[in-house]
Amino acid sequence: MGNIMDYLKWRGDLTFSQDAFNEVDNLLLSYVAYVNLEGLSVGAGEEQVTLEELSRRFFVLHSEEELAADKSFTRLAPYIVKMMAQSNRYRTSIISNYVNMVNPQLELQFSAVQLDLSDGSKNFCFRGTDDNIVAWKEDFNLGLGEVPAQKLASEYLNRFGAVSYTHLTLP
């Protein structure tokens, strides 16, 4: 059975005008939200860069040794994004409006990034639960009612022009 890396090898040469956006593309774009983009100048109000440039900057900033030491379940995200950045399908996607907030006292974890694709569509990717304790506490709190990240997700989408909302933004 194939995986998303196989998809990148199989369909990465095709632009969105040659093969329309699909569910696997959506899954791949979500990986961008799991990469630590701190220090890459793509925060809200900062630069807009291509995925190709973002990947280049990331691997200049982070050594292979540092990445190899990462044992989290999201450790492959930078490598998947690197493969995406080398493909015709994603390399020219514009990355912007990165936000990353973690506040243990508020039991808050919120991270989002905007990707503008070559077909003119805007995609807003949110980081879900990763392997830090704040994220897991927030997951448990979801069962009790609204969590701060839900409000932040709604504000993020309103600020950056999304017309539809994700699960995280639903009341």
Regions found by a protein language model. Name each.
Residues 1-165:
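Non-catalytic, mobile gating and regulatory segments of ester bond hydrolases
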Residues 166-171:
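Conserved small/polar residues in nucleotide/adenosyl-binding loops
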